[in-house]
C-alpha cells in the first residue's frame, strides 16, 4: 500500500512539472517565463512537501493497520493451536486409560491362571501323598497282623505246656496279655475303622440331626437352653470360627457351651443346659465382638475375666433377692449361694424366683396363722439353696442345704424346714409345714414347671457324670442338646492310645446306663501345653 501511495505522489509531481514546462513555453518573455518557472518551482516544492507529509501519514497509518492485522492473525493462530493441542491431549488420555484397563485385565487373567496352576499342583501332590500313605498303612497293617498271629501262636503253645492251668484261666491270661501288648494296635484299628466309615456317615448324621431337631422342638426348650447374640455383620461369623475352627473350638471347650453358626443373618446362637456357662459364653462373645481381637489367647483371657464378673453378678442377684424377701442380714456366702439360683432351673422354673415366691407365700400364710412372719420368709427363701451347688457337692439338695444352714448358724427352724420340705424328715414346727405348702403352691401352679425340661437337663447331667467317672478326665461337657459329650483329659495321665480306648468305654457305659433317642457322639480330647516366661 505504501508503494501505491508513493507512486501516486510521484505521478502528481510529474504532472505538476509537466504543467510548469508547458506554461513556460507559452510565455513569451524570458522574465515572465522565469517568474512563472520560479513560482512553479516554489509551488512544486510546496506540493512536494505536502505530498511527502501526507505520504508519511499514510505510511504510518498503513503500518499501524498492518501491525493490528498481524496481531489479530497471531491470536487466531494461537487459539487454533490451543484447541488442537487440547483435542490431541484428550485423545491421548483416552488411549492411555484404555491401555491401562487392558493391562489390568491381562494382569488379572495371568494371576487367575497362576492360581489355577498352583491349585492343580497342590492337588496332585496331595493325591500322591495320600496314595503313599495308604500304601504304607496297608503294609504296616499286614506286618502287624503277622506279628499278632505269631504272638498268639507262641502264647497258646506256652500256656498249653502248663498242665495245672485250666482252659478258662489260660484264656484269661491270653486276653489280658494281648490287650496290654496290643493297646496301640487296637487304637490304630479303631481309627482305621472310623476313617473307613466317615465318608458314608454324612447322610446318616444329617438324618439323626433332623430327628433330634424334630423331637426337641418346643418353646420351653428354646427359652431355657439357648441365648442369641447379634452380630454387626455376617463377616464377623468367619472371625468367630477362626482359622480351621480354632476360635470356636476354644470358646466351646472353655465354656462347655455349643456355639451354633448357621445361615441366619447376623446371629450366633449359644446352646447349653447350664445357664451360668451360657451367660459366660454370651458375655465373652459380646466382648470379643466389641474388642475386635478374636484369637484363642484372647478368648481364654475374656472367659476368665467374665467368670470373675459373673461371680459379682451372682452376688448382686443374691443381695437383690434377699432385700426383696426382707432378709438383709444373711451371711455373705449364703447370699452368693442364693445368687447362683438365678442361673438354675427346676422343671423349667427359675429357682431363685421360686425361692422368693415361696418366701413371700410363707410370710403371708404365717401372718394369717399368727406365726413369725420374718422367720417364715427366711425359711421359705432358703429352702432350696442346696440346688445351687448340688452339681459340685455330693448329696441331695436337701442334705447340702441342711449342711450349709448349720454351717452358717441359721435358726434350727430354718434347718428343719430345709430338711422336711420334701418329706425326708418330720417337720418340727408350723413354719416348716407352711413352707412345704408354699413350695407346693409355687411349683404346682399351671405353667410354673415343665417335666420335659427337667428330664432333658437330667440326661445331660448324667452324661457328664458318666464321663467324669473315668480316671484322668479333667472336664466333661454335654453339647448339641445331649447329642455329644466332649471330654478333656489330663495329658500326663492319659496317653494318645488310651484316648481312643476311653472313648469306646464311655460309649459302652452310656449305652448301658442311659435311655436316649438317636445317637450320642463321644469326643475325647488330649491337649499338651508348654508355657514359659521370658524375663
From Swiss-Prot:
InterPro entries listed in its UniProt record: HD/PDEase_dom, HD_domain, HDIG_dom, KH_dom, KH_dom_type_1, KH_dom_type_1_sf, Ribonuclease_Y, RNase_Y_N
UniProt membrane topology term: Single-pass membrane protein
Pfam families reported in the protein's UniProt record: HD, KH_1, RNase_Y_N
Region named Disordered: 107-145
Keywords: Cell membrane, Endonuclease, Hydrolase, Membrane, Nuclease, RNA-binding, Transmembrane, Transmembrane helix
Keyword Membrane attributed: yes
Name under which the protein is recorded: Ribonuclease Y
Catalytic class of the enzyme: hydrolase
Source organism: Streptococcus agalactiae serotype V (strain ATCC BAA-611 / 2603 V/R)
Bilayer-spanning residue ranges: 4-24
PANTHER family linked to this entry: RIBONUCLEASE Y (PTHR12826:SF15)
Localization, UniProt: Cell membrane
Annotated HD domain residues: 351-444
Record's function text: Endoribonuclease that initiates mRNA decay.
One GO cellular component, as annotated: plasma membrane
Location of the KH domain: 225-285
Amino acid at each position: 500500500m505504501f508503494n501505491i501511495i508513493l507512486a501516486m505522489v510521484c505521478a502528481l509531481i510529474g504532472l505538476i512539472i509537466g504543467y510548469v514546462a508547458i506554461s513556460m513555453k507559452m510565455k513569451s518573455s524570458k522574465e515572465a517565463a522565469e517568474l512563472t518557472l520560479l513560482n512553479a518551482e516554489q509551488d512544486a516544492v510546496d506540493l512536494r512537501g505536502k505530498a511527502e507529509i501526507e505520504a508519511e501519514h499514510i505510511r504510518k497509518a498503513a503500518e499501524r493497520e498492518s501491525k493490528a492485522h498481524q496481531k489479530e492473525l497471531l491470536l487466531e493462530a494461537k487459539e487454533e493451536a490451543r484447541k488442537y493441542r487440547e483435542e490431541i491431549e484428550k485423545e491421548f488420555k483416552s488411549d492411555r486409560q484404555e491401555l491401562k484397563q487392558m493391562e489390568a485385565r491381562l494382569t488379572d487373567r495371568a494371576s487367575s491362571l497362576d492360581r489355577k496352576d498352583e491349585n492343580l499342583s497342590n492337588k496332585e501332590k496331595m493325591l500322591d501323598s495320600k496314595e503313599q500313605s495308604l500304601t504304607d498303612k496297608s503294609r504296616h497293617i499286614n506286618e502287624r497282623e503277622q506279628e499278632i498271629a505269631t504272638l498268639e501262636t507262641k502264647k497258646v503253645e506256652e500256656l498249653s505246656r502248663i498242665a495245672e492251668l485250666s482252659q478258662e484261666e489260660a484264656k484269661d491270661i491270653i486276653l489280658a496279655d494281648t490287650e496290654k501288648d496290643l493297646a496301640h494296635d487296637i487304637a490304630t484299628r479303631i481309627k482305621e475303622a472310623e476313617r473307613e466309615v466317615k465318608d458314608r456317615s454324612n447322610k446318616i448324621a444329617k438324618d439323626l440331626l433332623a430327628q433330634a431337631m424334630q423331637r426337641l422342638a418346643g418353646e420351653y426348650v428354646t427359652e431355657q437352653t439357648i441365648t442369641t447374640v447379634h452380630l454387626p455383620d455376617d463377616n464377623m461369623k468367619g472371625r468367630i470360627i477362626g482359622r480351621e475352627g480354632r476360635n470356636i473350638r476354644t470358646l466351646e471347650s472353655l465354656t462347655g457351651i455349643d456355639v451354633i453358626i448357621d445361615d441366619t443373618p447376623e446371629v450366633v446362637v449359644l446352646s447349653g443346659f447350664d445357664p451360668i456357662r451360657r451367660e459366660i459364653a454370651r458375655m465373652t462373645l459380646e466382648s470379643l465382638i466389641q474388642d475386635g481381637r478374636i484369637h484363642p489367647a484372647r478368648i481364654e483371657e475374656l472367659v476368665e475375666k467374665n467368670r470373675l464378673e459373673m461371680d459379682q453378678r451372682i452376688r448382686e442377684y443374691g443381695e437383690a433377692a434377699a432385700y426383696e424377701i426382707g432378709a438383709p442380714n444373711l451371711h455373705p456366702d449364703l447370699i452368693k449361694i442364693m445368687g447362683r439360683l438365678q442361673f438354675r432351673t427346676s422343671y423349667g422354673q427359675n429357682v431363685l424366683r421360686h425361692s422368693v415366691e415361696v418366701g413371700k407365700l410363707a410370710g403371708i400364710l404365717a401372718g394369717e396363722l399368727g406365726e413369725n412372719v420374718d422367720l417364715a420368709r427366711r425359711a421359705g427363701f432358703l429352702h432350696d439353696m442346696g440346688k445351687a451347688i448340688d452339681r459340685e457337692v455330693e448329696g441331695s439338695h436337701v442334705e447340702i442345704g441342711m449342711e450349709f444352714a448349720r454351717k452358717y448358724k441359721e435358726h434350727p427352724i430354718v434347718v428343719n424346714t430345709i430338711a422336711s420340705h420334701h418329706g425326708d424328715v418330720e417337720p418340727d414346727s408350723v413354719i416348716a409345714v407352711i413352707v412345704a405348702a408354699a413350695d407346693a403352691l409355687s411349683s404346682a401352679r399351671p405353667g410354673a414347671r415343665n417335666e420335659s425340661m427337667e428330664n432333658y437337663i437330667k440326661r445331660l447331667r448324667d452324661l457328664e457324670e458318666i464321663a467324669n467317672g473315668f480316671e484322668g478326665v479333667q472336664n466333661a461337657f454335654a453339647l448339641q442338646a445331649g447329642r455329644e459329650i466332649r471330654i478333656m483329659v489330663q495329658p500326663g495321665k492319659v496317653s494318645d492310645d488310651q484316648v481312643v480306648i476311653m472313648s469306646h468305654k464311655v460309649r459302652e457305659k452310656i449305652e448301658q446306663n442311659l435311655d436316649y433317642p438317636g445317637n450320642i457322639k463321644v469326643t475325647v480330647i488330649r491337649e499338651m501345653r508348654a508355657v514359659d516366661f521370658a524375663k
